[in-house]
A protein has these predicted regions:
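Residue-level detector of conserved catalytic or cofactor/ligand-binding positions
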Residues: 217-230
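A short acidic, Gly/Pro-enriched loop at the edge of an enzyme's catalytic core
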Residues: 179-187
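Conserved alpha-helix/loop element of class I SAM-dependent methyltransferases that forms part
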Residues: 29-44, 51-76, 93
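S-adenosyl-L-methionine
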Residues: 124-178
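Conserved SAM-binding loop of SAM-dependent methyltransferases across substrates and taxa
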Residues: 87-100
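Conserved class I S-adenosyl-L-methionine
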Residues: 76-86
Length: 230
């Protein structure tokens, strides 16, 4: 039995049955249901009271607020890259909250299962997106109620559009091994640097930031605290 190697995509021989995907060790930080676990921890730290009833990632809110406060000092964020996007919750929220919204967003993760989850999350976000409160257009009046995604499934993505959701794409690959072919105005690296450090050491971190420098105008890094290394 073979399965692709996470780092390079080449098949690796195994002489035992493959375990279900949800039982595989997340050795690259590729946790399933990571944002659900992270949300539970955040609620616990607040004494059991959620900070945001809508569940929007607090890092996204901080980033959106920072961009708004410095709008006259930074260039417009048109292209966004999320390295180690997991199931893409922050990226999808950012695409919907930035004003003006980005024209292109790319999520990259080493885990193909998580990329599949991210694509499903994109369809779900599109299906559950509600019109603006002050909108009176015919399209707004016929929006898809949130409960319908459970009753009838998700809406198909539009066949052609220059805006959300068709401006969001996901790629399953090790970004450290790919070629730098595009320039981005914002790169997200959320809860990622620890795993690069663990697998590649100090030299790997330096190489990672070197690739970032080649690709970006602005970077948002989530710095891990010391207990996360233990």
């Amino acid at each position: 039995i073979t399965q692709p190697c996470r780092s390079h995509g080449s098949p690796v021989a195994r002489d035992w049955p493959l375990a279900p995907w949800f039982m595989e060790a997340p050795v690259y930080g590729n946790f399933r249901r990571y944002y659900g676990m992270r949300r539970a921890r955040a609620v616990g730290h607040e004494g059991g009271v959620a900070v945001r009833a809508d569940g929007v990632d607090e890092r996204v809110l901080a980033l959106v607020a920072w961009c708004k406060a410095h709008a006259t000092r930074i260039r417009r964020i048109e292209r966004v890259l999320d390295v180690g996007c997991n199931a893409a919750k922050p990226l999808l929220e950012l695409c919907q909250l930035l004003d003006p919204p980005p024209t292109q967003a790319v999520g990259v993760d080493i885990d193909a299962h998580l990329v599949a989850q991210a694509r499903s999350a994109l369809r779900r976000a599109w299906s559950q997106r509600q019109p603006a409160a002050d909108s009176t257009s015919i399209e707004a009046m016929h929006y898809f109620p949130t409960c319908f995604t459970s009753l009838m499934g998700q809406l198909p993505l539009p066949s052609s559009s220059a805006s959300f959701p068709t401006n969001v794409t996901f790629v399953a690959q090790d970004w450290m091994d790919g070629t730098v072919a595009a320039q981005y105005d914002l790169i997200l690296c959320l809860s990622l640097t620890k795993w690069i450090h663990l697998h590649h050491g100090d030299e790997g971190l330096v190489r990672f930031f070197g690739r970032i420098v080649q690709s970006l105008s602005l970077i948002h890094i989530s710095e891990p605290t010391r207990p996360l290394y233990i």
